[in-house]
Amino acid sequence: MEVSMTKKSISDTLRRTCLILAGSFIMAVNLKSFVRTGGLIPGGFNGLTRLIQEISVLLWHWEPPFSVINFILNAIPAVISFKFIGKKFTGYSCLMIVVSGILTDIVPSFPVTEDVLLISIFGGLINALAISLCLFANATSGGTDFIAIFLSEKYGIDSWNYIFAGNVVILGIAGALFGWDKALYSIIFQYTSTQVLHILYKRYQKQTLIIVTKRPEDVYEAIAEITNHDATLIKGEGCYSKQECDVLYSVVGRDEVNKVVNTVRKTDPQAFVNMIRTENLAGRFYQRPND
């Protein structure tokens, strides 16, 4: 048993590390080949780091290393994350911050296009991919991602759009200093990234399931085993058939929906499942903690 658990732990560590290294490399290439080429200021602490670099060049004609500024900015959020979110979570996040920062300083630039609109759109897509790989490893890319995860853990909300609103402030400062055209393109970059991230990463999104079934106990056991969520049993009657039926009502994480629905269909092939996106939720809802 211990050997099995050790193998599982090693496998999980390798998986998370590989995801973070891949995400770090993609983020560094994106920053050098898209963001810098287009003169964009991305959101979050990466954007704040770029803003500080640009201000330093403007005032002193010297560009400080990306990694050094980024490490300093992430110090306090990392401490907060360590205390309130999770130790391993913070450790892997710091690995992402360190590796992506160093790679950004040493990876050469490979400009793909000079079209700023294309850079804004595809750079945003690539940025979302890099962050998603990190989130799939149960970590973050640092900065505002720490804040987003903290808000999601504490209040159970999908906070990425709120973070986007905060990033607009950073972009507003960049626009006032360096011109509004690049700031507006940067907003396109950040909006694209936020919306794609919202699609790829579903941990903090909720889905309501309404299941009409002839095997309510078996279906409920499947829901409870997969999600650790409860369900409400409602007695109903078919309007056309006039036959009595059982209706299960449950709210689960959106990332759990496919597994739940597939299991329900195996348990009761005749089950009718309605999936409804849940915008807001008040009350107790179990959320798997970050480690």
Stretch-by-stretch model annotation:
Residues 2, 32, 60, 153, ...:
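Positively charged, small/polar-rich N-terminal and surface patches that mediate targeting and assembly
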Residues 2-214:
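Core subunits and conserved enzymes of cellular information-processing
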